[in-house]
Amino acid sequence: MGPFFERVGQDLADQGYAVFRINFNGGDRLFWKLPGATDYRGTFRDWPEFLRRYLKHNSITDILLFGDCRPMHKAALSVCRDEGVHIHVFEEGYIRPDWVTLEPDGVNGHSQLPKDPEYYRRVAAQLPPMPPHVTVPSSFKRRALEGAAYNTADILTRWYFWYWQDYRPWPPLVEGVSWLRRLAKRKKNVARSQEMLRRLKESGRPYVLFPLQLDADVQIRLHSDFRGIADAIELVVESFALNAPKNQLLVIKEHPLDNGLTDWRQVVGRCGKRHGVLERIAYVSYGEIEKLVREAQAVVTINSTTGTLALAENVPVFSLGQSIYNIPDITHQGDLAGFWQAPTPPDMETFNAFRRVLIEYCLVPGGFFSEEGLETLISGVRERLARRKEQQLPDVADILSEVRG
């Protein structure tokens, strides 16, 4: 996240808060120049007890972190709950672009958001009108450079952070080399994708979009039944072959941040050939996801935020994993076999109510990868933390008891 937490820390310090930081590796150290930092160089086994003592010694009342599924973070959250420390978890926005997720206690599959559509209709009806939408720029170049700097600092300081273990399945150096290879092939793959999209448009045939997620994404490994993307591809392609109308196409879109270590085009090709539908699958490495979503007949996803993008366009969505938006009246609630033939579109009143509740209680405007985005985000975080008691999600039982009374 680059300098995000340093900027948040400085803002909190300017307001008079005592701010502390724990670094796990050299990348963490690189992006924190403020006082109050401690390098944790111990083992994973010793981490919970270290943190427990640290919290008590420094009288910590609140903890801020990005994501809640990494092993060190999961252990930290367990300790913080035991010690009564308030938890604030950041994550990429449930709605993108222009938003960042900030929830108490947990996000995604650990979110407190309920699954009853009536809850959202009732809560949204009590909220003021939607605030004006603020569009913020985001730089892929900045994201890439900050990521490279973080990983380089991590590699160069492994001798110091001897016990640090990255949660990702590949060493940073391996990923870095693969990214360079991917960039070298970019021109060729862009041209191939443009040709595929041209042929798709000329065919005039309806298609279902399947946007791939990152293979190392913990949202797949912890919040779905899949071991990785290959398993999901197998299930989707097989179901498509058995149940989709013969005139329907399947468009599979590569994730823009995929590191290229696995050739997903080849994986998809072998799978399509095995199930006899290779000629009905369009694999796209590069392309405007918003346009692909708008023109799709439906979208099938594991738990990608592309799901909320599709729902906002009134495009039917099937969620294969745990997702915050997999709610009756919003996503297709039947099985995948029936989705190909008769996808259920979202009830837009319910989806808009759901979106309104997200923005009020779970999202902060802004972004990580531009100065304007960071300034907007820091301002929103300041306001959200200051009003955290008033901005707690309304109790499910209270809201639904009013309905069922």
Language-model-detected regions and their locations in the chain:
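Catalytic core of nucleotide-activated saccharide and alditol-phosphate transferases
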Residues: 88-186
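Conserved catalytic-core segment of nucleotide-activated headgroup transferases in glycan assembly
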Residues: 8, 15, 161-267
